[in-house]
């Protein structure tokens, strides 16, 4: 069966019922996974998060945005276009941000902006028994309490279903230039990348083709 929740409370109610009936639940985002994490191989309930795809709040001055998990990376950046800000993690596919957090997505921009782990400030999640928790902090500088947010990031739905995320934003660069370089060996290419990063040049992406 497929369930289409629209709020955190609905996710909580679904998980409470499934927990009581010992029914498996698999979260379903944008189905962009190449590894099949969204497949309900043991049956049960497929929890389709596509109807939870809203931007809940935007704080451009503090460079952060709070969203529901079903919004995709491209849709989020379209919403942010007028602000001059963007969400930096780019795994290639147009994944949902909830799925990106659940799988600790990375991508070609990680060399400059980091992975999903570094770009989630706080989150809300529903545990298997329906309990709703909040983890992390909206503040950039915080050392209070257990770091449960980073425990949930990359847990692939095994610890809970992410229902809300507060994400870091970055300014869109004024200019972007791309170049292709040839090297006599892979070792030479790697050494060039190391020296480039050590020199402090703000590289957004570095790929080996």
Explain the meaning of each model-derived region:
Residues 1-52, 69, 87:
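Glycine-rich N-terminal segment of FAD-binding domains in flavoprotein oxidoreductases
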Residues 54-61, 65-207:
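FAD-binding subdomain of flavoenzyme oxidoreductases
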